[in-house]
């Protein structure tokens, strides 16, 4: 899992030379996304952020980029990573915003784009290249009616969850830093500005492909697909149909990603096609949430009044989004094969795309079943395992048992008797229903060769004790608004080791307080 995250100021290593870092970020690369041209990106400087200061910093993300954690103490760090100019940039090296389109809440929304994010360049380390993007860096041509700013509240949430998801083992964009400022911005109330530095190998979304398809720009569509294949899916180059292979890989990664979400009780909140990564990463942390009291119909986004993106709907929506990606790729599928006519090529492309999309359930289902089987401590595969898991989820739903603690405490259940049942049993309103299920579970455990201790250790490696519950984030945010960033640092450090006991931090694993039920997050989050 890498080295421990630390937010203490480092005395051991010298601060990184920021001018060299800035120059490296700005250096153009022939195969970088921005080299695709003006149809894809608009270059512009970030809007200056007055008197910036560091709110949070991830040592772990810094090391991934080949940077020393001492970088956060370098003079000018906050200025560089909020987008304030540190030098006179030539036009060819300016940050850029990209254009894309997409479906929002199932409706075609037309042109969207990076409305408040600017990509400032790339860093390479350990054979991988990463794009760095500043979210909240000011207005762009794609801001629509927005002011281009992010607020401290949402930036802290994205920072914490990006890193938490990584340490849960779930593919995600990363977050290097949060930079704050006292500059006021108007949302439901007056808040202050912030910028979060997001990191990913690519920020290309399904919506990028939809944009060029919808605007009938086949050359740009093909250039985009070729870029993604060349940089991120090189095995697709040798396929009989590289573009069909791209669709297949993106669909598979999406199915497996959502299975991982479901396994930890994560709700994204706004699974629009412009929020879907072509690399199968969790991207765009807004009104997300980890389920506390289990409810399969749980909706974490207060703006989602119809429940389109409810927990139970996420697999179906992900599949639907892959259909949107497939539609955008249809003009490319089959171009490498001989066809008697364009109509014949197009007809075959539809058939091939449907075949790829038809595999989504058989990719998602087994991925989730494997994850749940591991969460239940079942090393062997048996025919009734899915039914056993579904019965557990049903009684959890009926009792609104805490999702994270239920699976964590199941490790204490013995295959021999009920003496270890109490911690998990106490989470259920209907104790009789739990007892009936526990007897079935014990019977199933008796078929396993592992002893209780070995099974419990394995379960604790996949069932986190700590997740980013909304009330934990809210506490850190409230303190940060008072310029006390210690809780952001402390919470991030706890979430860095989600599977470890960390008994000194038991309070972070407790059931949410009553006031947590009043918290709401929405698209403005």
Curated annotation (Swiss-Prot):
Q: Which residues bind ATP?
A: 113, 115-116, 135, 147-148, 198, 205, 284
GO-annotated molecular function = AMPylase activity; ATP binding; magnesium ion binding
Provide the alphabetized UniProt keywords: ATP-binding, Magnesium, Manganese, Metal-binding, Nucleotide-binding, Nucleotidyltransferase, Transferase
Q: Which reaction does it catalyse?
A: L-seryl-[protein] + ATP = 3-O-(5'-adenylyl)-L-seryl-[protein] + diphosphate; L-threonyl-[protein] + ATP = 3-O-(5'-adenylyl)-L-threonyl-[protein] + diphosphate; L-tyrosyl-[protein] + ATP = O-(5'-adenylyl)-L-tyrosyl-[protein] + diphosphate; L-histidyl-[protein] + UTP = N(tele)-(5'-uridylyl)-L-histidyl-[protein] + diphosphate
Q: Residues in the active site?
A: 274
Q: What EC number(s) does this enzyme carry?
A: 2.7.7.-, 2.7.7.108
Name the source's superkingdom.
Bacteria
Q: Name one Pfam family in it.
A: SelO
> Cofactors per UniProt?
Mg(2+); Mn(2+)
- Amino-acid positions noted as binding Mg(2+) in the UniProt annotation, renumbered to this chain: 275, 284
Q: What InterPro entries does the entry give?
A: SelO (IPR003846)
Family, similarity comment? Belongs to the SELO family.
What does this chain do?
Nucleotidyltransferase involved in the post-translational modification of proteins. It can catalyze the addition of adenosine monophosphate (AMP) or uridine monophosphate (UMP) to a protein, resulting in modifications known as AMPylation and UMPylation.
Indicate what this protein is called per its UniProt record.
Protein nucleotidyltransferase YdiU
């Amino acid at each position: 899992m890498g080295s421990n995250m630390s937010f203490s100021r480092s005395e051991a290593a010298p601060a990184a030379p920021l001018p060299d870092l800035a120059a490296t970020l700005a250096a153009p690369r022939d195969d970088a996304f921005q080299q695709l041209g003006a149809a894809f990106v608009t270059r512009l400087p970030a809007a200056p952020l007055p008197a910036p200061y560091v709110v949070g910093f991830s040592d772990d993300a810094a090391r991934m980029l080949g940077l020393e954690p001492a970088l956060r103490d370098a003079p000018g760090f906050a200025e560089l990573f909020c987008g304030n100019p540190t030098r006179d940039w030539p036009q060819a090296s300016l940050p850029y915003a990209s254009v894309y389109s997409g479906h929002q809440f199932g409706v075609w929304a037309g042109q969207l784009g990076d409305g408040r994010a600017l990509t400032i360049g790339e860093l390479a380390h350990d054979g991988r290249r990463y794009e760095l993007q500043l979210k909240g860096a000011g207005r762009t041509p794609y801001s629509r009616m927005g002011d281009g700013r992010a607020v401290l509240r949402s930036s802290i949430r994205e920072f914490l969850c990006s890193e938490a998801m990584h340490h849960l083992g779930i593919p995600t964009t990363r977050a290097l830093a949060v930079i704050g400022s006292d500059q006021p911005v108007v949302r439901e109330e007056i808040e202050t500005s912030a910028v979060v530095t997001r990191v990913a190998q690519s920020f290309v979304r399904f919506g990028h492909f939809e944009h060029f398809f919808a605007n009938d720009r086949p050359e740009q569509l093909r250039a985009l697909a070729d870029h993604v294949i060349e940089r991120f899916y090189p095995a697709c180059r040798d396929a009989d149909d590289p573009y069909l292979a791209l669709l297949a890989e993106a669909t598979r990664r999406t199915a497996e990603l959502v299975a991982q979400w479901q396994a930890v009780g994560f709700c994204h909140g706004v699974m629009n096609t412009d929020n879907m990564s072509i690399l199968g990463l969790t991207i765009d942390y807004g009104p997300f949430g980890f389920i506390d009291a289990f409810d399969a119909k749980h909706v974490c986004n207060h703006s989602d009044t119809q429940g389109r993106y409810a927990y139970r709907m996420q697999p179906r929506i992900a599949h639907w989004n892959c259909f949107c990606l497939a539609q955008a790729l249809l003009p490319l599928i089959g171009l490498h094969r001989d066809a008697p006519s364009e109509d014949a090529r197009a007809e075959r492309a539809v058939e091939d795309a449907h075949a790829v999309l038809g595999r989504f359930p058989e990719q998602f289902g087994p991925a989730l079943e494997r994850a749940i089987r591991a969460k239940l401590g079942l090393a062997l595969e048996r025919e009734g395992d899915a039914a056993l898991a579904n019965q557990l989820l049903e009684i959890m739903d009926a009792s609104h048992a805490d999702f994270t603690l239920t699976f964590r405490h199941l490790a204490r259940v013995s295959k021999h008797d009920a003496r270890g049942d109490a911690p998990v049993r106490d989470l259920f309103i209907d104790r009789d229903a739990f007892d009936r299920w526990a007897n079935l579970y014990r019977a199933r455990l008796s078929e396993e060769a592992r002893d209780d201790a070995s099974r419990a250790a394995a379960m604790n490696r996949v069932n986190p004790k700590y997740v980013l519950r909304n009330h934990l984030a809210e506490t850190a945010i409230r303190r940060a608004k008072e310029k006390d960033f210690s809780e952001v640092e402390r919470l991030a450090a706890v979430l860095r080791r989600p599977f470890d006991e960390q008994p000194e931090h038991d309070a972070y694993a407790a059931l949410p307080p009553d006031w947590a039920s009043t918290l709401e997050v929405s698209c403005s989050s």
